[in-house]
Design a protein with these regions (language model features):
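Short, well-ordered alpha-helix to beta-strand connector turns
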Residues: 53, 83, 112, 133-135, ...
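ADP-ribose/adenylate-binding Rossmann-like module
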Residues: 79-85, 171-175, 182-213
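Active-site capping/gating segments
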Residues: 105-106, 205-245
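Structural motif
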Residues: 4, 55, 114-116, 168-170, ...
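Short acidic low-complexity segments
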Residues: 44-45, 153-166, 182
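Short, charged/polar "capping" segments at the starts of alpha-helices
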Residues: 15, 65-66, 143-149, 176-181, ...
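Phosphate/diphosphate ligand-binding glycine-rich loop within oxidoreductases
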Residues: 2-110, 197, 202
Length: 250
């Protein structure tokens, strides 16, 4: 059986999801096709085309729309109000959030005590859940949204200067905002989840955003191939295969 897969979002031309997931599926002996599809409105697109695909990876601006369109959602979707994966089972759609897994797995080999999150969107909510044990602080340009997250997740709203001094600084900021806001030396580790842009120097260490892309994709492949969040064989080797595919796609 050849599965038909796609990644949806806008803009989508830069997405490396097809390359990394097809490389992993080939390594696992699975057959699939994987498309990039420009979609701005999931509610409009899904009824017309959704039944043609076995699973759909979702990026911005669709993650917040998916929860309301699925027949069932996992606990992480409920906690984050964000879904980045839709799995079709018979005539129903199941929504999942694998961003939480992608975030935590990317940072797993690092040591840190304090965590700060920059941003207030869907990815920031996933980071809140992924690092909830560390009671993360938050900074956002939109103070109203930042205060809403503070109330929803019990985090602490802080000034930018304080956030940048954390052991682990997770940036979910769009565009060049992070470059515009930084420019000094910082004591911690920067985890910039956006992989398609240059990240600022000045931090003591760096977690590339491509690592999150790969680990959240491994989370999606777990669901695609097992129906649940069950680990796949030798995921460390699978990560290396996917990282190589991402580098070749540059």
């Amino acid at each position: 059986m050849t599965r038909r897969l796609a990644v949806l979002g806008s803009p989508i031309a830069h997405s490396k999801s097809p390359q990394i997931q097809l490389a992993a599926l080939s390594q696992l002996g699975e057959r699939a096709s994987f498309e990039r599809i420009e979609v701005k409105d999931l509610e409009e697109w899904l009824p017309k085309h959704g039944d043609q695909f076995d699973a759909l990876s979702l990026t911005m601006p669709l993650k917040e729309q998916a929860k309301a369109l699925a027949d069932s959602v996992d606990d992480l979707v409920v906690q984050t109000s964000s879904a980045n994966y839709l799995l079709r089972e018979n005539d129903s759609l199941r929504a999942f959030n694998t961003d939480v897994f992608g975030l935590s797995a990317s940072a797993a080999r690092h040591t840190f005590e304090s965590v700060a999150i920059l941003g207030t969107g869907a990815s920031a909510r996933s980071a809140m859940v992924a690092f909830s044990d560390f009671k993360p602080s938050i900074w956002g340009r939109d103070t109203t949204k930042a205060r809403a997250l503070e109330e929803a997740y019990g985090c602490q709203l802080v000034a930018l200067e304080h956030a940048l001094d954390a052991d682990l600084v997770i940036s979910t900021l769009p565009g060049n905002a992070l470059l515009e806001l930084t420019g000094e030396k910082y004591p911690g580790l920067l985890f910039d989840i956006i992989y398609s842009r240059p990240s600022p120097g000045g931090f003591a260490g760096y977690i590339p955003g491509i690592h999150m892309l790969i680990w959240q994709a491994i989370g999606q492949l777990r669901i695609l191939l097992t129906g649940e969040d069950n680990p796949l064989p030798d995921e460390k080797s699978l990560f290396e295969v996917m990282l190589n595919a991402a580098e070749l796609a540059e």
